[in-house]
Amino acid sequence: MTGRRSFWGWGLEKDEPTNEQRQETAARLSKRFGREVTAPPVPRIEDVTLRAPRTTPPASLREFTTSETYDRAWHSYGRSFRDVIRAVRGQFDNPPDVVAYPRTEAEVVATLEWCGEANLTAIPYGGGSSVVAGVEPPEGGRPSVSIDLSKLDQVLEIDATSRAARIQAGVLGPALEDQLRPHGFTLRHFPQSFEFSSLGGWIATRSGGHYATNHTHIDDFVESVRMVTPKGVWESRRLPGSGAGPSPDRMILGSEGTLGIITEAWMRIQGRPVFRASAGLTFDSWQAGYEAARHVVQ
């Protein structure tokens, strides 16, 4: 996946709809709903005006931070329908003041320390596919910093014997699979947002995947988690399994970035399938389809 992300919609700028495609869509909608529908122009970053940043990062952080219009607009919203509509209309009323792109865990620590010292809102940002306002700065609040983990995107270690991999949290789904593939492995977690969502985001939101008839949620793959908190770096103990009391990982899974910024995790991986096949089936009723799916799964 190469190219710059669209600041207003899903995908890359190079894949934005052409004028002809937009007009065709408007014509179909007009016919379908019996009223005139016009296609709005594709938003241009040159037309976006944001409020001035309310804070400035210290010199030690400026190498990997920015307050450019594109970066702030892109990190203003997730990708829910409401988010896209506001972005198309150019309604960026509450953008983050600074966007940080830390390249190491130490830079994540330094950024979070600055946020604490300066009383700033820190917002972890993975792939930006949130549909519940998880990456949106709170209204009427303090200056905010969006901490984008996209530079932390590597598979650091593979334990082939135990079938586990140590993976940085900012890696997106396709890049993760690309790095596991040469070793004969796959994570086999494919949420709908797979193309533009990150491992850290999957863990923080307790992601569920499409191919989920066996391992339903990301929970099933997590061996241990490492994250930066306001009190320092925290890491759960990596174990093949444990029955000793509550699992600390369960506290992190689904925490939505409220407890800290996930930087890496040990994940259970699987061997890549030798054969793959797919088929489509039709049923006479919803109930018949439901019953068939239930029998297959059970």
Where are the regions that the model predicts?
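Short, basic and Ser/Thr-rich N-terminal targeting/leader segments
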Residues: G116-A118, Y125, S197, F221
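FAD-binding subdomain of flavoenzyme oxidoreductases
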Residues: D153-Q298
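N-terminal flexible segment immediately upstream of the FAD-binding catalytic core
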Residues: M1-E113, V131-R163
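Residue-level detector of anion-binding/catalytic polar loops
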Residues: L120-T121, T186
